[in-house]
Amino acid sequence: MKSFFITLFIVFLSMEAYGQHVYKGHVSNANNEPVEFANVYAETGDSSGVHGTVCDINGDFKLQSDKENPVVRISSVGYVSKEVTLTSDTTNMITLSQDVTLLNEVVIKAQRPQYELSSEGMVTNVAGSILEKSSDAYHLLSLVPGIEVKGESLNVLGRGKPIVYINGRLVRNENEIATLQPDAIKKVEVITNPGAKYNANVTSVIKITTRKNSEGFALDSKSTFVVNEKGRPSFMQNILAGYHTGKWDFNGQLYGAYTQWPDDKYLAEVAHLDNKMEVRNNGVQSRSKTRPYGKLSVDYALDDESSLGASVSYDGTLRLKGNGTVYGSVLTDDVTEENLTSDYTSRGHSGIWSGNVYYLGKIGVFGVDFNGDFLWNKNNEDMSTNDMTTLSSGETDKQNVNTSRTDLSRMLAGKLVLDAPVWKGSLSYGLEYSYVRRNSDYTVVPQDVVDGEQSLIKEGMGSMFLDYTRKFGKLSFQAGLRYENVDFKYYDHSVLQKAQSKNYSEWFPSASLSWPIHKVNFQLTYASDIYRPSYYQLRDGVVYDNRYTYESGNPFLDPSISRNLGLSVSWKWLYFSGMFSRVTDEICSMRQLYKDKPNAVLAIYENAGDYNNMRLQLSASPTIGIWHPRVSCMLYKQWDYPVESYGTPASSINKPSVSCSIANIFDFSWLTATVTYSFQSKGNMGNVQIVRAAHDLDLSFYKALLHKSLILQLDVYDLLGTNDSYSRLHTGPMFETYYNEFSTSTVTLSVRYKFNALKNKYKGTGAGQAQKSRM
């Protein structure tokens, strides 16, 4: 199979795009501003072999033709159409004149659809819409159909955590999203069924495109103050600076934050053995973190088609502190046998260095995209726990446990993608390789509580892909094939564990069809993705929580694969999508007794089996005067979930769940206000059963001053304190787990000042994303 791909690679490099010419152009108006989404098509009588296209948001286009110097017509709403003769030796610069129709002094304007289907997914147009007045990038993304935002955590409904690109550059740190300003964003694309171009473990993609840079120096500073319901403050300061001149683009970022948050939880483990045994843990906890972040990047444009650059960043945690008390109890047949008070403190620190170099350009007819990456990540955490157990007889027992964990990960990765016009379409070929070395050390004092851990993981991952796209009239076709090989080696105390070391090889086909019917756009997709266990899930040692609760990984886990068939439909401000998935070797957190102790439960990951699921989503965003409602709802349903659960028939593990978000945006001339209500129903998702519906009410206020140079934002999250999460985990035929997380209401005030609006032009897309996510 590998030789098959290598042969294709040689053929790909050696072949010429027979009879095909590639023409490039840039369309602008009289003010030298790009004309986005202008139509480029052949003039009558000279259309043989010419394929129409559309300009991107920067006014740039590529056109393939088997004729030399074709004559094409350029048109766009609001401009006079223009005929030009294209040349292939340079970028064709085309200027359109405005054509404003006046009827009784009323200007007739065209409004772009809110939602559009791209060749890969659904596009939400932000530029010129009410979304530009969101309080921050996360708030904006929460208003995009299919995206769920909790704090700084993104989730694509029904598809899990996405990877994010900004201007084609892979985002490696959530801080890059947090510091992105909404009015700098042009559009957001959500891909729920990624094809062969993406790593097979990628289940969803968010692609953010921003506006172009201005010449000269630019500055953007934002200060944020947060108070939570406990009265604990947090502070964040972000400074972006850049300088753009000629072919050079320099950018720098400094970010600092001190954050505090409560972390109260309730956990109950129930085991139905000879007797019913129940362990309850009610944790009252708080955490704080001091975090510095810095990044430098430089780009150089070799010409209109080629650029290269480099970047380096540091993301640290100077101090991660946690403390709290866990109140526990053990019940046998509902009678309390003993009570536990567990006081703990934890301290940690971490540092992540990462870097990227890239080249993006052309060699002959071939487009070249190369990225090289490195990553160094070290984490340390120490914890001290004081347990006091009181028996029903009144006797007490005390125990002090100290744990220390150190993880050190290093990664090198490279990625090369070539593309060329082939058979009136476009063919892409990609190669990627990454190597990871991860050391983990975990010690416990006293040593008889749990076994320590000293492990080493070495993992090499190689992948290759082919992707072909072509248009047949109004029908767009894409097909791809990806091959991935993972060589995983696990060492315990420097000794190779052959039973736990594995080699995986998988093929991942993908295909899509897109077509319009009148003003309605349709897209049908097929793709498969894989979930490889994280290094945390593959660890071998046991982690001590308290004398009743322990956690462990499982080095014997197999990857889980999902095969997905999707349909999307869009019309103006309406969008619908549906997806059916077949999942094999689902990975779940299960429960068992720890070392046969009658009152100690071990949480461990296992492969459960196969099942089917479906999700349906409907979104609408009409405009009614100053009111801009945005409604998005999703239905999730699963069948034949493979986990057994005590006292619960299989049908009860397959109940549907519904989530809805209703954002009411009111755009007054002097203020923009948003009232957002979110709802999560009861139901099942995987082995998690939501046992109580959750409600969330958020408020946001946006005010721009000094020609939008000064922006004030006020946000209130979880105003009513009703966004708590109550879950039951189905963890085995003899076990039940109940887990509750409690929401925190916060008030946030932000002050932002910007000068000569700054956007980063860095075009490195990154390599080794699959390994970075698992690290």
What are these regions (language model features)?
Residues 45-60:
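Short, acidic Ser/Thr/Gly-rich low-complexity loop/linker segments typical of extracellular
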